[in-house]
Amino acid sequence: MISKSDIEEVLSRYNTDKVSICTICSHTALQIFHGARVEGFKTIGICTEDREQLYKSFPQAKPDKIITVEKYSEILDPKFQDILKKNNVVIIPHGSFIEYVGPENISEEFTVPMFGNRQSLAWESDRERQRKWIESAGLIMPCKYKDPSEIDGKVFVKFPGAKGGKGFFTVNSENDFYDELNRRVKSGVIEETDVTKIGIQEFLLGVRYYPHYFYSLFEDSGMAAGKGNVQILGIDRRIEPIDEAYRGLPDVPPEFFDYTVTGNQPVVLRESLLPEVLSFGVNVVDASIKLFPPGIIGAFCLETIYHPSRGFVVFEISARIVAGTNVYAGGSQYSQFTYKEPMSMGRRIAREIKIGLKEQTLSEIIC
């Protein structure tokens, strides 16, 4: 695994007056580029040719420089990494970055400095380790089924990685499980390799909330955790085709029973629930410091369901910026309680890097 000292050695050769913010052109890239631009950084987008025009279409969010690739896995080529290093690049990982490049490759082959702790991406991508992390934080999780033969009621079936709900399904029995699984494999919705890492959880009733957190080592606003503070910058819920199935439509066609995320909506919680939600973020940070020091750094999100009779249940963690933050590119209801200026998650990441450069503490938030 690439060590912290390996990255520090690369950073030592950087011209810190010319650091660029870089990511793959997908997911939250527009928000990341916009936030970096506002904070005074040059930006570099790694883009496939078919997406170039999109990222050139937004004057305030287009990258200053685009590097075109045929496929995103090319960034693992040592020569390509050298190009990024010569541009004094700090990579901002997001869901598409992890999915296209792969968490193992990020840990073993990608030696370009990244914002945050790359160990947290490995913990996010492994269902067992993720569960250990969440439970170590003292949070309630859905009941887990180790084998399809244990299914005794409605369950939710998930696959590993940042897939945005693609291929997920619900079933009520072992037979239904295999029918749905085989159908998805045959249609190419999921890969054969995904089947061995399948996750089966109890199906939960309630309202979905996805709070967006930022763990800062450099700012003192928020709730204390570890050596820094946890801020809450927004909350969203995801829009999925399955949502349309519950609008009173008669004879709902099967294609509506799909959990692929297609968009996001802004959400505001009842203020009485905020202390508990903020404490979740603190507990997750404290647990991460013990499990994989120095722990998670920067942006993360908890995927939760709330029901008045049961409270919050946390069913997943995303250990980096999430697509739901795109609804707050101009700041959120919560970020304006902390900052006088509009503060998106993309800008907040750039702000942390900016402080690290100014205080000569960049290595504390880069790995």
Can you describe what each PLM-predicted range is?
Residues 29-34, 53-54:
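Short N-terminal binding/cap micro-motifs at the start of the first secondary-structure element
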Residues 1-10:
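Positively charged, low-complexity intrinsically disordered leader regions
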Residues 154-158, 212-213, 304, 310-321:
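A short beta-strand motif that forms the metal-chelation/ATP-contact edge
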Residues 49-156, 162-163, 173:
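Conserved N-proximal alpha/beta basic substrate-recognition cap immediately N-terminal to
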Residues 213-288, 318-350:
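ATP-dependent carboxylate/phosphate-activation module, predominantly the ATP-grasp catalytic core
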Residues 201, 292-309:
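A short glycine-rich, hydrophobically flanked beta-strand micro-motif that places a catalytic Asp/Glu
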Residues 41-50:
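Short internal beta-strands
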Residues 73-74, 120-233, 271-282:
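Active-site nucleotide/adenylate-binding loops and adjacent lid/helix of ATP-dependent enzymes
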